[in-house]
A protein has these predicted regions:
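Receiver (REC) domain switch/active-site residues of two-component response regulators
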Residues: 166
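Acidic/aromatic-lined carbohydrate-recognition and catalytic surfaces
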Residues: 1-158, 162, 173-176
């Protein structure tokens, strides 16, 4: 993100009369949250910045500098699935192993294996349970019907809006 900050005047110097910039009025950032993959579409922490890109402080500076120039910031927000290393999913797997489906398991598409047809990719868990994972086993799907999940998503979006984000691109929610 520091590289973007360093080159903002080339994108938009904030003065419409100069003609020395590209006149950019929006920047869309692909996933920037912590993730074990190179593409960052399997988020482990929706409230932070992957160290490959900077810190929350760097992000705040980017937003501030962009807004000074009339540039909006759009974040890619991955709400269809998380990382298999996300703390909620790890807790959900533990709960399923204990035969409990009332806690974190409700955040994910965890059902008896018989629930899924043969075309649906899943992570097989214990007790004849599985979690839907259409993209890859490393990306378990959120249960978008769950009130707990929706409340968490409301917190996530509020967190980023409070930091000055102007909007979101919702990734892969059409899979739901």
């Amino acid at each position: 993100m520091q590289g973007i900050i360093d080159n903002l005047d080339y994108l938009n110097d904030g003065d419409p009369n100069t003609g020395n910039d590209l006149g950019v009025d929006g920047i869309w950032l692909t996933p920037i949250m912590p993730s074990p993959s190179y593409h960052k579409y399997d988020v482990t922490d929706y409230y932070n910045i992957d160290p490959d890109f900077g810190t929350l402080e760097t992000f705040d500076k980017l937003v501030s500098e962009c807004h000074k120039r009339g540039i909006n910031i759009i974040l890619d927000l991955v709400l269809n699935h998380a990382s298999s290393q996300h703390p909620y999913y790890l807790k959900a797997v533990e709960e399923v192993e204990e035969g409990n489906l009332d806690g974190y398991a409700q955040y994910f598409e965890i059902h008896p294996t018989s629930y899924f047809d043969s075309d649906t990719q899943t992570n097989y868990l214990s007790h004849a349970m599985a979690c839907e994972a259409n993209f890859t086993e490393e990306m378990p799907e959120w249960n978008l019907n769950s009130e707990k999940t929706r409340e968490e998503f409301a917190k996530i979006t509020k967190f980023w809006l409070d930091r000055g984000v102007d909007g979101f691109r919702l990734d892969a929610v059409n899979i739901f």
